[in-house]
Amino acid sequence: MDAYTGFAQVYDLFMDNVPYDEWCAYICETLKKHGIADGPVLDLGCGTGELTRRLAACGYDMTGVDVSVDMLQKAMEKQTDPPILYL
């Protein structure tokens, strides 16, 4: 049974105080520090895609992966440009 079934519907409400913008800035800074200014990045455990979308907006070719189909469906509902592959 998917532990996140049902929880995906309220996940973003529980996570609304998470500093995703700060996390994204830190990750982008770290990637650039190591010579990765763009290109493919895999977000394992992407949940509803909040961080994934922010990283895509920074120019990374994002793929989001999550074990929960419900979380992935929520992430796909938020699909923006550039497109993100969710698996």
Enumerate the predicted regions with their spans.
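N-terminal, positively charged/glycine-rich alpha-helical extensions of SAM-dependent methyltransferases
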Residues: 1-9
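Class I SAM-dependent methyltransferase SAM/SAH-binding core
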Residues: 42, 50-87
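Conserved alpha-helix/loop element of class I SAM-dependent methyltransferases that forms part
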Residues: 20-38
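Conserved acidic
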Residues: 19, 47
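Conserved class I S-adenosyl-L-methionine
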Residues: 38-45
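Class I SAM-dependent methyltransferase Rossmann-like catalytic core
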Residues: 8-18
